[in-house]
């Protein structure tokens, strides 16, 4: 199962993951074969405040595009974006430490085997996306692997 947790409280997705595992076990699948991946929008900067400032224009642009397909003509306000970037929310925006905490919080909820970061959204320049990938690889991934007992393979 690949679970896109893009907004709101990640806890709201837990019943879906629980049902998926329950159905798989009832169908006879061994627990080690019942995999869960979590995916979400991510932006890492030196501080939480800097990440919010830098990522807001791209995330707002992304949602404006998505909303246009559904006939919604409401822009994402900075205040809404700041709330969506809070500690207990799904959006992975902040310092490396905050990203680690959010991934680990969701790991405790879902017990997922894989996390997929959606970085290049909303017209973000390549240089910004590359910087985020580098921070993810150097500052976040090693800690997550250590905390979850996973190897880099």
Residue ranges and their predicted role:
Residues 1-153:
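Active-site-adjacent structural elements that line small-molecule/cofactor binding pockets in enzymes
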